[in-house]
Structure formats: C-alpha cells, structure tokens
Amino acid sequence: MADRKTALVISAHAADFVWRCGGAIALHQELNYEVTVACLSFGEKGESAKLWKQDGMSLTKVKEARKDEAQAAANALGVNDIRFLDLGDYPLRLDQVAQEKMVDII
C-alpha cells in the first residue's frame, strides 16, 4: 500500500467536492490513487435551503441528509475514504481542535 499514490480533497461544504473537482477525483481514481475527501462542514445553513423547506426538518436531519448525499457522491466517484469534521457553517471556524483534526488527516 505504501507505493500507492494519494490525493487529498478538502471541501468546505459536504457537496462542494462533487461540483468543484468531481472530474479530477474520478481521474485520480482511474489512475489508482487513494483519494481522501475531508468535508469541513455539512453546509447545513448556507447550502441546504431545499431541505429546510421540508416539514419537520431539524438541524440533525439536515446534517444527516447532507452526509448521505456526500457519501453517495463519494461512492459514485469511487472514494472509499470520506471524513466529516462537522465544524459548523456560517461561520465556519478553523480553531485549534479543527486544525489538529486536519493535521491528522494530512
């Protein structure tokens, strides 16, 4: 496994990696890279307007839906390693604990 090339995608919101670099991810998967996607936030506030319009929606349900969407997209792209840091949304702050989580991923 040590000889396998790796790629790291850092995505501010759970779905950003798909439309910002889905093609690059697919290409790297095809080239046998081990791709890791790190989602800093679920985008539960600024990226989830349609979900919030549904009856009975809660913050927990929005996050679960966004996680499921991102996981499905990662699966479609062949990504086996997707990490969700759940750092919040609007504001998204990278405090010391969050920085340490990123260092662990890198």
Language-model segments: residues:
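Active-site rim/loop-helix segments in enzyme catalytic domains that contact anionic ligands
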Residues: 1-106
